[in-house]
């Protein structure tokens, strides 16, 4: 529910959906290149990002927002050996139940 609520905020949606960003040098910080670790943003059509994570208790985790046609999904993977692969399969299955075929960059 928290992710669904957060994705209603356009600023949040823009930030978590940003693939990469360059912050030029300033008096406050050196030059920074920031890259989103949710690489499904560039390989799975309709993915709008959200968050990767890891803790010893929860393992590798991934929360993902995706929209194709009129179907919006939020998937959550916890304690995954391969969170991206698990999410890819979950999104394919979920969109498939609505008759939506998505061609991702994954094999």
Positions of the model-derived regions?
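Domain-terminus/edge residues, biased toward the C-terminal soluble/receptor-binding domains
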Residues: 1-107
């Amino acid at each position: 529910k928290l992710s669904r609520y957060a994705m209603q905020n356009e600023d949040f949606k823009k930030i978590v959906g940003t693939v990469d960003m360059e912050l030029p040098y300033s008096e406050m910080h050196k030059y920074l290149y920031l890259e989103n670790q949710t690489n499904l943003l560039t390989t799975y059509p309709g993915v709008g990002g959200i968050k990767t994570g890891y803790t010893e208790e929860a393992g590798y985790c991934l929360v993902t927002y995706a929209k194709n046609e009129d179907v919006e999904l939020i998937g959550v993977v916890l304690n995954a050996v391969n969170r991206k692969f698990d999410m890819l399969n979950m999104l394919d299955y979920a969109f498939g139940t609505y008759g939506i075929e998505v061609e991702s960059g994954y094999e």
